[in-house]
Amino acid sequence: MDMPPTPLPPETANTSPAPNGATAGIRVENCYVFKSRLQEYAQKTGLQTPEYHTFKEGPSHEPVFKSTVVINNTSYDSLPGFFNRKAAEQSAAEVALMEIVKSIPANANIPAVQETGLCKNLLQEYAQKMNYAIPSYICTKSASGLAPFICTVEIGGIQYIGAAARTKKDAEIKAARTALLAIQGQSEGSANGATKYIVVPGKRVGKEVEKRPIETPKPLKVKKGGFKKKWNKRKFMKKDGQAVDVEKDEARVAGDAHDSDVLMQPTVITQEASCGTLFLQPCEEAKRVEAEPPRDIEMVQPDKENQHSDAALVQPDDEARVEQEPSRDISVVQPNEEAISGKQEPSIDAAILQPKEEASSVKQEPFIDTAMLQACKEAGSVELGPARDTVISQLNEQDRAVKQEPAGDIVVPQPDVHARVVKE
């Protein structure tokens, strides 16, 4: 007995297009039913079991197989060029079946193929491999005649009409035979060179060169390394005891030793001829007090009009108090954070200056006593000699500079907050 068929490798795949306008992508693959069908035919007809002779050809690393089947003393050769033994035997069995179907029963010992029912089986196997529906047979019977039955088979959406027969079974076999011959005839003239056979040798799949995907150049990314470079530069310069980054130092003050980003205004000290000592605080403007002989004291106010009076009291936060003691020439002004004191002669009017952004000047006569400033304390007292007036200047944000004539004393202004003045 013949061994059960096994699937064929991909080399035996049929490359012929599907018949009857089927999709070109559908192929009849692994058609290994022909040996079993030929074995069945031999058993029903009483013939000997088919004998297969397979030959190996070609080099050992790429062998090619060819097979020959012998049935009823007739040999049928397979198509050449198969890459395995089983595929060659299947091809030989197919060739034998096709030749038997085409033959006419000339000898009584060999009955007709259509009588064995092989055509219906082949057509059904073909439909299964092509993923078609099972072939359907429709038979009609005429009123009279020697062959009243005519059968039509439908496969793949196409109907095939068989020849007339005496019985319904014979009519179905003839219809299946007609369908097989039509399918084989349509596959003969295929453009890809395929033959009328289903099992055909395939092309050996060579080792294709591995195609590496084309690498598309990626756009270069902008490196954000500016800060890193500056940081490294600063670190290196700090280690060597040098200055920090030059670019950042442009926005800084050269004397800023703490690497602060806050801009500091340089301290400016000005001094004029014939003037006393001048002291200025940073971040504020200088205020000057000049003394002239017999002039009254002037008051400069950027936002208000000038005011002249014998005695004027300014109270920015609290009330001003004036006290006088008879036998003292020293005047002391003690604001919360700033105090300004000055000595004046009698018969000089007192004026109070309160500019916020501009410099104020106080003119005094010579022979002015010493003024003392004491910051960061509570309100002070002004002590003057008899018949002398007091001069008080209060600034919130600007420095005050005291300028005097040759006989003048030293005035040290320390501006910050409001001052309280006491006059008697």
UniProtKB/Swiss-Prot annotation:
Gene Ontology terms, MF aspect: double-stranded RNA binding; ribonuclease III activity
A Pfam family: dsrm
Record bears the keyword Repeat: yes
Entry keywords, A to Z: Repeat, RNA-binding
Region (Disordered) location: 1-22, 287-330
Domain of life, per lineage: Eukaryota
Statement: the UniProt record of this protein carries the keyword ATP-binding: no
InterPro entries: dsRBD_dom
Biased composition (Basic and acidic residues): 287-308, 318-328
GO process annotations (BP): regulation of gene expression; RNA processing
Residue ranges, compositional bias (Pro residues): 1-10
Domain DRBM: 33-102, 118-185
Cellular component terms (Gene Ontology): nucleus
Record function comment: Binds double-stranded RNA.
Protein name in the entry: Double-stranded RNA-binding protein 8
Protein source organism: Oryza sativa subsp. japonica (Rice)
